[in-house]
UniProtKB/Swiss-Prot annotation:
CDD domains: BI-1-like_bacterial. It is found in: Cell membrane. GO terms for cellular component: plasma membrane. The chain crosses the membrane at residues 21-41, 56-76, 83-103, 109-129, 141-161, 162-182, 202-222. This is Uncharacterized membrane protein SPy_0358/M5005_Spy0301. It is a multi-pass membrane protein. Belongs to the BI1 family. It comes from the Bacteria. Keywords: Cell membrane, Membrane, Transmembrane, Transmembrane helix.
Length: 229
């Protein structure tokens, strides 16, 4: 990654910044999808074997994922060359762990959830870019609600309520839809606050945020659409 790439302050510069971010999001989602495909088809027997005989591999990967999110975010904000490789490694590992979730659903359900996620992502991105309303308050509310969802999800691990799981998924869709819009507005604010002097590190940081929004939106919609799978 070139640490010295600078985007000039202008509509063209802002568009270039957005293009850079969305190309990174596309790379991340594409890499995750590719790894998930490998696990679900060529290596399906290995996936099932891990689920049945070695579930700690999955949990270990999930823990490493969590660590990589913080490492990638920190590296990106410091504009270090390691930020992009870490982001891509995280995306690949996330594809691995996602396959253990996706395997429980019908193929049509997965495609339906993915296409719906893409449509929501596109619509909310436009809203975030075009709206004149300050969404910083909404952003704080969404993060507060997200904490509540995490707590409720942990509680439901012990309760095992199907209805509670459904409600959590619906609320999660609303939360991540709001975050997609606010993150897109944040991209504009970061660009404007730095007078257009933003390097690749910020592009990776914002791409990571949008990637996480999309993946979590996809998982939430997958659970909603796949209730009967």
């Amino acid at each position: 990654m070139n640490d010295h790439v600078i985007y000039t302050q202008s509509d063209v510069g802002l568009n270039q910044f957005f293009a850079k971010i969305y190309s990174l999001v596309g790379m991340g989602v594409g890499l995750s999808a590719f790894v998930s495909y490998l696990m679900l088809y060529p290596f399906r027997e290995n996936l099932i074997s891990i689920l049945v005989n070695q579930p700690m591999i999955y949990y270990g990967a999930a823990i490493i994922e969590l660590i990589l999110v913080f490492v990638a975010s920190s590296a990106a904000r410091k504009n270090t060359p390691a930020a992009l490789p870490i982001f891509l490694i995280y995306s690949a590992l996330n594809g691995f762990t996602l396959s253990f979730i996706i395997v429980a659903y019908a193929q049509t359900t997965v495609f339906q959830a993915f296409l719906s996620s893409a449509a929501v992502f596109f619509a909310m991105s436009i809203i975030g870019v075009k709206t004149k309303r300050d969404m910083s308050g909404l952003r704080k509310a969404m993060f507060a609600a997200l904490i509540g969802v995490v707590v409720a999800s942990l509680i439901n691990l012990f309760i095992g309520s199907g209805m509670m799981s459904y409600v959590i998924s619906v609320i999660s869709v609303l939360i991540f839809s709001g975050l997609i819009a606010s993150d897109n507005q944040m991209i504009k604010r970061v660009y404007q606050a730095t007078n257009g002097q933003v390097g690749d590190g910020w592009a990776v940081a914002m791409a990571l945020s949008l990637y996480l929004d999309f993946i979590n939106l996809f998982i939430s919609l997958l659970r909603i659409f796949g209730r009967n799978d």
